[in-house]
Structure formats: C-alpha cells, structure tokens
Regions:
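Long, acidic, intrinsically disordered low-complexity segments
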Residues: 1-28, 160-161
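Nuclease catalytic cores
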Residues: 33-34, 38-79, 125, 129, ...
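Active-site-adjacent bridging/hinge elements
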Residues: 37-46, 185-192, 278-285
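A short beta-strand motif that forms part of the nucleic acid-binding face
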Residues: 49, 192-195, 236-238
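A non-catalytic, helix-rich entry segment at domain boundaries
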Residues: 69-156
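Short, solvent-exposed loop/turn segments that connect beta-strands within catalytic domains
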Residues: 80-85, 162-167, 180-185, 223-226, ...
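Non-catalytic protein-protein interaction segments used by genome-maintenance enzymes to assemble
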Residues: 149-220
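Metal-dependent nuclease catalytic regions and adjoining charged, substrate-binding loops involved
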Residues: 217-324
C-alpha cells in the first residue's frame, strides 16, 4: 500500500507560484546576482544591453546531464520504490541520452561549432557513469523513504525579495526538496558537480553559500514554512577521487564520490544574503522594474576577467586585458 502523502507536501505540490509576466515584470536569479557582485559592467552588458555570448562548456553540459539523471532516479524511487528505480532505470543509458542531448543543444546555440573534443567528451562521460554507479550502490547513506517524502525536483520559487520593487521577482529552481514527517522538517538539496570536491576555501565562499541561503529564505516565505524547519545542503558529486588503496589517501572520504556540506544558515547569515539581494536590486532597478540607466563599474581582476565571456572584445571592455 502506498504511503499517505502528508497534507503539507500535497499543498506545496499543488500550489506552484504564478509565472512571471515578462511584459511588465523582471526576473532576477542567483546567477544574475553572482555576476553583478563579480563585475557590474559584465552584468550590464548581458542583462541591460542584451549582448549575449556563448558561455556553456563541457562542465555545464556534464552538470546538467548528471542533474537530470539523479533527479529522474529520485522521482521514480519516491513515486514507487528504490528497488523499482534500481531495477527499472538504466542510469548509464539515461545519463548518456541527457549528456548527448544537452551537448547537441549547446552545440546549436554555439552556431554549430564544437566546444569540446571526443577525448574530453569520453572522459566526462566515464566520470558521470562512475558517479552514478557509486551513488546507486551507496544511496542508502543519503536518501531513504522511511518517514521521508520527495516534495519535488526542480521546485520553482518566484517571489519579490523587496516589496518596494514588486515587479522585480527572484526566480529559482530547487534541485531536490524532501520532507521528513518524523521531525516535521524540510531539506533543500542543491546538486553540484566538481572535479575533486570543495576545499575549505570553496565552503567558506559566501557567494556560493548565498544560493542555498536565499532558497531557504524564499521557500519559507512562499509556502509559510518556519525557517527553523528548513535544512539546506550542497550535495557535491566528484568526478575524480582517490582509490581507497591509494598510498596518498589521508581519509576514506577522499574515495567517496559524494561530499555533503551544509552552510550555516542562522539569522546573521540569512540577513547577509537578503542584504546582498536588496543591494543588487537597489543598484540596478527602478521602482517600476526597469533597469537603471547609469554607469556600471568595471572590477577587473585575474579571476573575474579570465572567466568573462567578453574578455576578447576590447570595444566592450578593455579594463581586464592587463590580467589576461
């Protein structure tokens, strides 16, 4: 007999937010805010001037495909059972289809020019298969149906962070949200792919932390869930790991394909995340939602300029060429 789904889970599933009306509303996102905090001028080129540049890579293709495979597995597992998911889903085939499909999509977006080669494509594919195989074998460490329900994958958030700017809406999609009936708590999980996992520097990167902090804040506001009943976690999938018998291994965790990290999310941290969004909105938007016509400063550095899609175009920005 199927478990009775808790009413709070049904309520969230059945009440998605109203879609953005782009005729008069503007959407912002974590990625937009992150770009602005790195370099306001880059944000202006992309979002005000609408000068789009191809930014995908084998890393983004890989990440999208792994996300899709993981989310499909969890959808089936929680809808039926983990045994059924293990039996009925060929993870390698599903991942391969998603991987090839996403590459083809981005290939077309790149004016039908390749941005990877066969050797690199094969390496990343084999890494993905290894991650998914390891996850299936160790799944019970991370996900269970005992008193736990899947609220959804790619759960949408659409909300106005600043009520003085009602036409500026924050939009995001939560990778995985679960609900534990025993403790009456929700967990928001953000899946990340990484070469070797996150080091201490990455974990302490406040800009990275803001993504989940804002998801927690806005999930709470959108569905009326107390903040203290919401947990957050980065679920980091590693492409490269040491063998458990490797002489250089310092900890068994170095052989794990999964790394979990829950950033602090108390009042102070949430306050800093809210301030970052409000500062972004105040700097960039008018009260009616229009983008301000102003000078957006350039903040050149080796890090920001190296990853900037406009770095070769001096007519758009010459500030970073000393760092190239």
């Amino acid at each position: 007999m199927a478990k009775k789904i808790p009413s709070i889970v049904k309520e969230i599933r059945n009440n998605p937010p109203s879609p953005i009306n782009f005729a008069f509303q503007k959407n912002i996102s974590y990625s937009q805010m992150s770009i602005f905090r790195g370099c306001p001028h880059r944000w202006k080129l992309q979002y005000k001037d609408k000068i789009k540049r191809f930014t995908s890579s084998i890393h983004t293709v890989f990440g999208t495909a792994v996300h899709e495979a993981m989310q499909h597995y969890l959808d089936v597992a929680y809808e039926t059972s983990f045994a059924a998911a293990d039996r009925d889903i060929n993870m390698e085939e599903y991942f391969q289809e998603a991987y090839i499909g996403e590459y083809q999509k981005q290939y077309k977006s790149n004016k039908s020019e390749h941005f990877s080669d066969a050797a690199e494509m094969r390496e990343f594919f084999e890494d993905g298969v290894a991650i998914l195989d390891w996850f299936k074998k160790k799944r019970s460490r991370y996900f269970s149906k005992k008193g736990t329900y899947l609220v959804g994958c790619e759960l949408p958030i659409v909300i106005a962070p600043n009520k003085m700017y009602n036409n500026v809406l924050y939009m995001g999609y939560l990778d995985v949200v679960t609900y534990c009936e025993t403790t009456d708590t929700f967990k928001i999980i953000d899946i990340k792919t990484s070469t070797k996992g996150w080091n201490d520097y990455s974990k302490k990167d406040e800009n990275k932390q803001f993504q989940l902090l804002l998801y927690k804040q806005y999930f709470s506001e959108q569905y009326g869930i107390p903040l203290e009943k919401i947990e957050i976690e980065f679920f980091i999938l590693k492409r490269k790991v040491l063998d458990i018998d490797d002489e250089n291994i310092m900890s068994p965790y170095q052989a794990y394909r999964v790394q979990q990290f829950s950033p602090p999310s108390g009042k102070i941290k949430l306050g800093r995340a809210r301030k970052a969004v409000n500062d972004f909105i105040n700097e960039c938007f008018n009260s009616d939602g229009g983008i301000k016509d102003k000078i957006y400063p350039k903040t050149p550095s080796k890090w920001t300029c190296n990853f900037c899609p406009y770095k070769e175009e001096k007519e758009l920005c010459e500030a970073g060429h000393d760092f190239m």
